[in-house]
């Protein structure tokens, strides 16, 4: 497979990602979760971004606070002064995206832009903090990905949108994305197969798979030739890669 020209992807394959910092072991998307992953040796941290009603960018997955914080309220409808009072699992504050950038200056950040409201604050942060070499952006919205590509061009590493993934799996390689970041299956449709991985590699596109927590499945996917795995169980993935001699 040709090497990617983007600096975000210059780590030897396979790349291990701590998904939300390691959501099975720590309160997800919190500084302690990311700190634990970095202590294990992770250089790639996966996170999500949401924006408050007053445009403050947060590292947080849901718009609704109930699942992780146990309180009513939507981030997009509340000012940061209110959202900042919430605690993940009752104890950890929701971090600002800027906190994550500052706390882990050597980490690469894989970012899922969750909403349209988060797009402009995210773009501003990428410019302000000169982050283009150390981030990759994905989204379930093709429109959001397209807007970011128009803003930054190929200097911004972007993952395939769902519609681009569908084209890739059907045999037509889309243009514009630097990487495929995908589940093993999308509903009934297999996504990660030997054939799809080979097709991506033929076009110079690495394949990262989420979210894989079982050691046997990690081995199976690595045997297929995937280039990265995202996991909620960072210790398990580290041990698998150590066993294979590919923990770097």
Where on the chain are the PLM-derived regions?
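Phosphate-group recognition and catalysis centered on beta-loop-alpha active-site segments
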Residues: 1-248
């Amino acid at each position: 497979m040709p090497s990617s020209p983007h600096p975000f992807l210059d780590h030897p394959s396979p790349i291990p990602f701590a998904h939300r910092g390691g959501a099975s072991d720590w309160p997800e998307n919190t500084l302690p979760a990311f700190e634990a992953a970095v202590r294990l040796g992770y250089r790639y941290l996966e996170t999500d971004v949401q924006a408050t009603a007053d445009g403050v960018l947060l590292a947080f997955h849901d718009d609704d606070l109930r699942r992780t914080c146990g309180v009513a309220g939507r981030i997009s409808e509340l000012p940061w002064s209110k959202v900042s009072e919430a605690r993940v699992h009752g104890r950890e504050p929701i971090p600002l995206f800027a906190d994550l950038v500052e706390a882990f200056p050597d980490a690469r950040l894989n970012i899922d832009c969750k909403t349209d409201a988060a797009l402009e604050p995210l773009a501003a942060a990428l410019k302000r903090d000169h982050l283009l070499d150390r981030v990759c952006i994905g989204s379930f919205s093709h429109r959001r990905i397209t807007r970011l590509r128009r803003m930054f061009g190929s200097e911004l590493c972007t993952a395939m949108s769902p519609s681009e993934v569908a084209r890739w799996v059907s045999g037509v390689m889309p243009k514009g994305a630097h990487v495929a970041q995908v589940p093993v299956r999308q509903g009934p449709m297999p996504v990660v197969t030997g054939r799809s991985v080979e097709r991506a590699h033929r076009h110079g596109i690495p394949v990262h798979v989420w979210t894989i927590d079982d050691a046997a499945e990690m081995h199976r996917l690595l045997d297929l030739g995937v280039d990265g795995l995202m996991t909620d169980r960072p210790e398990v993935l580290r041990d698998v890669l150590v066993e294979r001699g590919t923990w770097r």
